[in-house]
Amino acid sequence: MFSFFRRKKKQETPALEEAQIQETAAKAESELAQIVENIKEDAESLAESVKGQVESAVETVSGAVEQVKETVAEMLSEAEEAAEKAAEQVEAAKEAVAETVGEAVGQVQEAVATTEEHKLGWAARLKQGLTKSRDKMAKSLAGVFGGGQIDEDLYEELETVLITSDMGMEATEYLMKDVRDRVSLKGLKDGNELRGALKEALYDLIKPLEKPLVLPETKEPFVIMLAGINGAGKTTSIGKLAKYFQAQGKSVLLAAGDTFRAAAREQLQAWGERNNVTVISQTTGDSAAVCFDAVQAAKARGIDIVLADTAGRLPTQLHLMEEIKKVKRVLQKAMPDAPHEIIVVLDANIGQNAVNQVKAFDDALGLTGLIVTKLDGTAKGGILAALASDRPVPVRYIGVGEGIDDLRPFDARAFVDALLD
């Protein structure tokens, strides 16, 4: 009986265990499925997260790349601009250096050309400048001063020399009479003694032309108006006068009144830069307006001297002569007593034509002085005698060279000595 019950229990145990196993297996399977599901969800979540991070990283990298591209492009653009500016600066520097070198070379050449003349002194430089005129007269007068008795033949020979030296008929007649009187008064007999008589006669004739320009002590600008024909050396004389007045401690202002020639303005600007002097100019407008502005500027700045350039003109060009009269009138409006000095610049090479020019400009403007230039380039040094006889306007300055210091006040004694010694 008991064994029956025991056997029955043994039979029930495997079934129970199997159910438990199945239940455990099912539970494990469920848990495993849940784990797999969780893993799958985690994997998907991780994948999404990684994808987002990757996309974000890609976007960040792309943005960085674009930024780098933009930065590089900006840097390249700036580099190109800098290169262009550098190239422009290099070209400008080249031009500036070339200009500076050119000016320096010009100054050195001029300095070399004039160094010996400066060493000689003005009297010797004047004599050197009048070499052509002196040599011509010396050859012509060799027979006159070479000895022999003073007679009518000798006088006729002397008269011919004076006429061919551009002294003109009036001056020649005056000199011949004066020489005859001296010969008679002193009892001269020999041709060698005529030189001294001629020198004194010529000196007495041209001495009245020796009236140096005296600048008044005033607070107002002293206005000097310059006129003349083209090529006489007007603009160059203005540049030299500026240097001359500066050496006397005067402040100078230049008026580029030659509005017909652009080259004249440029030339005057160059002289202004060379002397560190202000130049008043206009690309348009007339000469009178430029000169008026220059005087106004000089008064405002306390300048001592105004040098007013005007356009070159022939006395026969009546409309241009009327224009230069207008310049004078406008200057008088700028300052009631201006221009204080009206100077005509004469080229000594034109000989007797200089007398006609002086007459025409004097009649039109009322000249106060003359500048005779280029005496070193002509054999017509006798022109001063003709001027003294026909129209004795004071010769303020004479020029005997290209150097900036080769324009000096006229000295009658030095001139005669340089011409006849």
From Swiss-Prot:
Q: What's the main place this protein lives?
A: membrane
Where is it located?
Answer: Cell inner membrane; Cytoplasm
The UniProt subunit note reads as follows: Part of the signal recognition particle protein translocation system, which is composed of SRP and FtsY. SRP is a ribonucleoprotein composed of Ffh and a 4.5S RNA molecule.
Q: Name one GO cellular component term.
A: cytoplasm
Organism (species): Neisseria meningitidis serogroup B (strain ATCC BAA-335 / MC58)
- Signal peptide positions are none
Keywords noted in UniProt: Cell inner membrane, Cell membrane, Cytoplasm, GTP-binding, Hydrolase, Membrane, Nucleotide-binding, Receptor
Q: Does the keyword field hold Iron?
A: no
Write the protein's name. Answer: Signal recognition particle receptor FtsY
What gene is this protein a product of?
A: ftsY
What is the recorded membrane topology of this protein? Peripheral membrane protein
